[in-house]
């Protein structure tokens, strides 16, 4: 009789343990499936989006949405590279990435220097991003400096270098980069600050637009401070070297 009672009690307990084990197994199956989905999306979505934007302009970016939420508005006017002054890509190369035409999306010397500088002076973060890296960030990603975003940025950089090529990268860069609060792209900036289309910008005007790019919410194209004025002059002079040495020739179509 006692044995029968023990067996009767052990059966519900065994069923309970079985259900718990099944639940744990189901949870881990879900986790594995979720990881698989994330990996597949990470491998598929970036190439597809890069291919699409090889042919069409992005309607909006994450940064634009962020600024809209912050109340900055959005002035975004797409123009082809042919409809911009040639001084614009020259100024961008002079200021942001002198090896743009010869690198493959990454300037490892600049990255190493930036890392050493940031170790010595953590309160003054210095970037080592190329124009291609900045374009990948501006078009596809969110603002920030975390390592996850930088890793995704590197993957997008490889893709746009392979699929877009230098002319399209420069065209995209000059169309989506932020020149002021809610002002995106060279055409919107040219109309806002100089009351003319981007095709008619002078070298000095292009240099001033590019000069504010590191801190477009802090530095003003309309009322440039002394540092922006000095930076504009430096870029303007460096553009001569860019032209003479053909450092921006790869963007010609």
Label each region the model flagged.
Residues 2-253:
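Juxtamembrane regions of bacterial inner-membrane/periplasmic proteins
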């Amino acid at each position: 009789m006692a044995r029968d009672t023990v067996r009767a009690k052990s059966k519900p307990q065994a069923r309970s343990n079985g259900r718990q084990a099944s639940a744990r197994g189901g949870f881990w199956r879900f986790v594995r499936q979720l990881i698989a989905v994330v990996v597949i999306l990470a491998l598929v979505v970036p190439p597809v989006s890069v291919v699409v934007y090889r042919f069409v302009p992005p309607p909006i970016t994450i940064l634009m949405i962020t600024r809209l939420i912050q109340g900055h508005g959005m002035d975004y006017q797409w123009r082809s590279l042919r409809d911009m002054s040639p001084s614009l890509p020259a100024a961008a190369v002079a200021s942001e990435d002198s090896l743009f035409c010869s690198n493959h999306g990454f300037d490892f010397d600049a990255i190493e220097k930036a890392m050493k500088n940031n170790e010595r002076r953590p309160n003054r973060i210095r970037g080592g991003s190329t124009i291609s890296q900045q374009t990948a960030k501006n078009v596809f990603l969110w603002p920030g400096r975390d390592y996850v975003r930088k890793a995704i940025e590197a993957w997008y950089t490889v893709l746009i270098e392979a699929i877009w090529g230098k002319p399209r990268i420069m065209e995209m860069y000059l169309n989506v980069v932020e020149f002021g609060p809610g002002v995106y792209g060279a055409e919107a900036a040219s109309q806002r600050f100089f009351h003319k289309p981007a095709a008619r910008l002078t070298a000095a005007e292009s240099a001033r637009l590019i000069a504010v790019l590191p801190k477009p919410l802090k530095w003003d194209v309309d009322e440039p401070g002394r540092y922006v004025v000095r930076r504009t002059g430096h870029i303007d002079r460096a553009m001569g070297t860019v032209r003479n040495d053909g450092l921006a020739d790869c963007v010609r179509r």
